[in-house]
Amino acid sequence: MRLDNRKEHILDFIVRDFIGTAFPVSSGRIKEKLYRKQALAGSPATIRHIMLELDEDGYLYQPHTSAGRAPTEKGYRYFVDNLMEIGEPDYGIRHTLDEIIDNFEEEADSVFDELSRALASHLKLFSGIGFLDEGRIFGHGLPEVLKEPEFFENDVAVRFADFTENINGNIKGLADMEVDANGFGVVKMVFQDNDFGECVIFSAGPQRMNYEKANSVIKYAAKDIKKRKNKKHG
């Protein structure tokens, strides 16, 4: 069931702003950045009331030390399912992926390893490609992810490291993971390849990850693989 327009506008702004800043979002910031920019009517009291309703409905929560709100798992899921806009990745990463995939005549393992490193470097997330039929995976980027503020607490960093280990040991489980798996964010695309069978390209990180950017890059990489790898079978 969809939220009404005002709630969607505010939830969309909070998710995007929190992804970009890692700071809880106040009603004053919404009034300044969203309502003035889009010329929407609404007093700070009205905005606070809508935020409270989103909080009570489970889309937002209030961190103990802040007057602002941040998205919950439910809030992120609603954003991904209903509000996210996926366009083409920027030219730089498209060019990089094209060059990597064009080298499929070389050793496939080295190409997939380079692809995983490129995804991890661009997205700053634990990223890679796995092969479900073979039960193997190429994944990189854990050190970069652990620089995010969510992982400054050692126990959270350890949990995420364990999470990535579980990905390495359970490729089929990765293909079935939801966007908010185990308290972390996951973006993935499963596709079929003529030579390698069922494959999954993925990125994983904190829930406060850029889902639009990750989705656009992963979809482009999967399309690139299918287009270039399968054209010899066409």
Question: What are these language model-derived features?
Answer:
Residues 20, 24-82:
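N-terminal helix-turn-helix
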